[in-house]
Amino acid sequence: MAARSLEIGPAGMLAARTIEILRTERGLGQRHIAARCTALGRPMSNTMLSRIELAKRRCDIDDLVAIAEALQVSPAALLQGPGAA
């Protein structure tokens, strides 16, 4: 049986958009954030981060926590939208 990809819901879409907005507002590249996540113990490539931002890859809770720490915001801020950070 072929694996089905899981649909990304509204919260995932909002988090993806918020990650991209906060990253670009801070003038940080995807490689920088991915490297910070890796340094924090959550291996991530810039391609993985790009796919998360484009909502082509699901962002699991461990990804979310590492990305939030790399962006110096709370994980909740990523779920609430760019105005919450």
What is the predicted role of each segment?
Residues M1, A84-A85:
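Short intrinsically disordered terminal tails
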Residues M1-R26, A76:
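A short, Lys/Arg-rich alpha-helix, primarily the initiator
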Residues T24, A35, E69:
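Alpha-helical residues within the helix-turn-helix
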Residues T24, T38-A39, L54, G83:
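Residue-level detection of the helix-turn-helix DNA-binding "recognition helix"
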Residues G27-R51:
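Short alpha-helical DNA-recognition segment
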Residues K56, D60-A77:
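DNA major-groove recognition helix of helix-turn-helix/homeodomain DNA-binding modules
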